[in-house]
Design a protein with these regions (language model features):
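Conserved beta-strand->loop/alpha-helix structural units within folded catalytic cores of enzymes
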Residues: 56, 196-201, 224-229
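Catalytic cores of alpha/beta
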Residues: 147, 207-223
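Conserved strand-turn element in the central/C-terminal portion of the radical SAM core barrel
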Residues: 112, 163-176, 188-213, 232-238, ...
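Radical SAM [4Fe-4S] cluster-binding motif and immediate context
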Residues: 29-198, 219
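Glycine-rich beta-alpha loop elements in corrinoid/cobalamin-binding modules
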Residues: 1-18, 233, 239
Length: 326
C-alpha cells in the first residue's frame, strides 16, 4: 500500500511473505446463493466447485503476471509459487462433496501438472476416494502417457491446454514459450488415447504480430485433434512483460486500465488492425476445420458486410452440423 499526500509519497508498506496456503481455512460458500455453484461443462450443467492445489505458476509467459510475481518475491527471498498439502486438498474435496453435494470438481491451478511423479501418485491415490469427474488446465509439455492414464482412471474428464500461438520463433521470442510445434502435436495425441476430451486456447493480437503470423496459429490447430479450439484477443494487463512492451512501442498509454473481457482488441496496430484481429477470431474455427479449398470463401466471410455476413451464417450452420457434438 502506498499513500500519497499533496503529490508526495508519505508511506510505502513493505511486501510481506506470501500467505501460507496450507493455513487457510476452507472457504465458506454458504455466504453465496447455491445457484452460483452450477456451471456448464461440455454441454452439461454440474454442481461444481473450484479447488486450489497450487498458487502461482513456475512458468514465465510474457502475457501473464507470473514473471513479475516471481521476480518480485524472489528479490525478497520468497517464492510466490506454492503447493497445498495433499491431505488438505482431500479435506476440501471431501467437505464439498459431503456437505454441498458437489458433482464435479475443477482445479483452477494455472498449470495443474506442475508436480513430480511422487506428487501425482499421491494425488491419484487420494482422489480415488472422491470419485467425481474433474477438469484441469495445464501445458502440453507437462503431459505424458503415465500421468494422463493415471488421472483418467480416477476421474479426469476434460483438460484445457494453453497453446497460445503457432509460430515457433514468435512464440519463443515474444511469449517466452519455447517448445516445438511437432512436440505439441505429439503430446496432444495422448488425451484421446485414454478417453479424455480436451480444448486448446489460443491468443491473437499480440504486439508486433501480423495476420500472416496469426495464420500460423490456425495451421498448428489444424494438426491438433482438439474437441474444441478457442481464440481470444490479447489483453495487455498491468504487471506483465508484454504490457511494458506495448507501452514502449506506444501502443497503449501507461494510465490505460484493461479489462478481462473486451468488446474489441485494445491495441491499434498498423500491421494488424483491430478489424483484422476480429476477422481472424470470427472465422478461426472455420479455418481450422474446413479444407483449405474453402479458405477463399471463408476469407469473404470475414467481411462485416451483407454478403460476408450471409456467407458466414451459412458456413457457421455447416460447421455446427459437421463438427459440433449432437
Amino acid at each position: 500500500l502506498w499513500v500519497k499526500k499533496n503529490g508526495k509519497l508519505t508511506k510505502k508498506n513493505s511486501i510481506t511473505k506470501p500467505v501460507d496456503i496450507n493455513k487457510n481455512p476452507i472457504i465458506d460458500t454458504s455466504l453465496f446463493e447455491e445457484s452460483r455453484l452450477y456451471r456448464p461443462m461440455a454441454g452439461k450443467v454440474y454442481k461444481m466447485y473450484p479447488i486450489e492445489t497450487i498458487r502461482g505458476c513456475p512458468y514465465t509467459c510474457k502475457f501473464c503476471n507470473s514473471p513479475d510475481q516471481m521476480k518480485l518475491y524472489k528479490g525478497l527471498g520468497h517464492n510466490f509459487f506454492r503447493k497445498k498439502k495433499i491431505d488438505l486438498v482431500y479435506r476440501e474435496l471431501k467437505y464439498f462433496k459431503d456437505v454441498h453435494q458437489i458433482e464435479y470438481n475443477y482445479f483452477w491451478a494455472d498449470t495443474f501438472l506442475a508436480m513430480n511423479r511422487k506428487e501425482l501418485d499421491a494425488f491419484c491415490e487420494m482422489y480415488q476416494e472422491i470419485k467425481l469427474p474433474f477438469w484441469m488446465q495445464t501445458r502440453p509439455e507437462t503431459i505424458n502417457d503415465y500421468n494422463i492414464e493415471k488421472l483418467s482412471k480416477v476421474g479426469l474428464h476434460r483438460i484445457s491446454f494453453g497453446v497460445e500461438h503457432g509460430n515457433e520463433e514468435f512464440r519463443a521470442k515474444i511469449l517466452d514459450r519455447r517448445w516445438k510445434n511437432k512436440d505439441i502435436i505429439e503430446k496432444l495425441k495422448i488425451p484421446h488415447k485414454y478417453g479424455v476430451a480436451f480444448s486448446v486456447n489460443n491468443i491473437t493480437g499480440f504486439p508486433t504480430e501480423t495476420k500472416k503470423l496469426a495464420f500460423d496459429t490456425i495451421e498448428l490447430n489444424r494438426h491438433i485433434e482438439a474437441d474444441n479450439a478457442n481464440i481470444y484477443s490479447f489483453v495487455p494487463f498491468h504487471g506483465t512483460p508484454l504490457r511494458k512492451m506495448c507501452e514502449e512501442l506506444g501502443l497503449i498509454k501507461p494510465e490505460t486500465i484493461t479489462k478481462c473481457l473486451t468488446n474489441k482488441p485494445i491495441l491499434n496496430m498498423p500491421q494488424y488492425s483491430p478489424e483484422e484481429i476480429e476477422a481472424v477470431k470470427k472465422c478461426f474455427s472455420l479455418y481450422v476445420k474446413f479444407p483449405k479449398s474453402r479458405w477463399k470463401v471463408i476469407e469473404r466471410a470475414e467481411k462485416n458486410d451483407t454478403e460476408g455476413n450471409k456467407i458466414y451464417k451459412e458456413l457457421k450452420q455447416e460447421y455446427l452440423e459437421k463438427y459440433m457434438p449432437k
